[in-house]
Design a protein with these regions (language model features):
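N-terminal subdomain of lithium-sensitive/metallo-dependent phosphomonoesterases centered on the IMPase/IPPase/PAP
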Residues: 1-42, 75, 129-132, 190, ...
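DPxDG-like acidic metal-binding loop motif
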Residues: 30-93
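Residue-level signal for inorganic ion chemistry
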Residues: 11, 44, 77, 86, ...
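Conserved beta-strand termini and adjacent loop/short-helix elements that scaffold enzyme active sites
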Residues: 22, 119, 142, 185-187
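Oxyanion/phosphate-interacting regions
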Residues: 128-133, 147-221
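Short loop->beta-strand "edge-of-pocket" segments that line small-molecule binding or catalytic clefts
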Residues: 102-128, 133-142
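Short helix-loop capping/hinge motifs at secondary-structure junctions, enriched
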Residues: 65-67, 91-94, 99-101, 212-217
Length: 221
């Protein structure tokens, strides 16, 4: 709750844009066409395990009728002191002790293996089926929205998510991926959008460095 309070305090210094957070709302998002979407701790299991794979997620959302799209996002990993940020009008960037610079997706080309990133705690039958369709692949396990961020920075190609998530779990990283030239699609292959008011749960989604794998993704649904 302390992280939530600090984030809300700092966002309010910018303007009075409503804030939707996993820990509680500030203002009415339906009163305007934009809102902040906040997850003060993404990766609770990783936080408990003390493996460092948890993040703070903040997204600026724009409303389109009853759906919302992320236009800017910030993902911060406190343990590594690394921040990923960007969106549809701001090229994505990574800043941290290992260096600073603009990011761009870097999809693998045959005969190189597809670089697949998956959750360290959630893996089921559909994950296995999708991996089998890829054929030649390398798998990295990771927690929180870091999985999407390494796609954005060019270190992975695909992050399929078949498990349950909420809007604040991925929206910030979605913006970062978009700003790096990648895509985040729903089960039909369309750009993932969000409901931040009522049904906060996301459908399954795929984060990808490009659209080569979208057809296989849609067929699996």
């Amino acid at each position: 709750m302390a992280a939530h309070n600090l984030i809300v305090q700092e966002l309010k210094k910018i303007d009075q844009t409503p804030i939707v957070s996993e820990e509680g709302n500030e203002g009415d998002p339906l009163s305007t066409d934009t809102c902040w979407l906040v997850d003060p701790l993404d990766g609770t299991k990783e936080f408990i395990k003390k493996n460092g794979m948890f993040t703070v997620n903040i997204a600026l959302m724009r409303r389109n009728k009853d759906r919302w799209n992320p236009i800017f996002g910030v993902v911060h990993a406190p343990v590594t002191k690394t921040t990923w940020f960007g969106g549809i009008v701001i090229p994505s960037e990574r800043r941290g002790p290992d260096g600073t610079g603009l990011m761009m997706v870097n999809p693998s080309m045959p005969p190189n293996p597809v670089r697949l990133v998956a959750s360290g705690t959630h893996r089921g039958e559909k994950d296995e089926l999708f991996a089998q369709k890829l054929g030649n692949y390398d798998l990295v396990r990771m927690g929180s929205s870091l999985k999407a961020c390494i796609v954005a920075e060019g270190s992975a190609d695909l992050y399929p998510r078949f498990g349950p998530t909420s809007c604040w779990d991925i929206a910030a990283a979605h913006a970062v991926v978009s700003g790096a030239g990648g895509i985040v699609v729903d089960p039909s292959g369309k750009n993932l959008d969000y409901d931040v008011i009522e049904n906060i749960l996301n459908p399954y989604f795929l984060v990808a460095a490009d659209n080569r794998w979208t057809e296989d993704w849609v067929k699996l649904q």
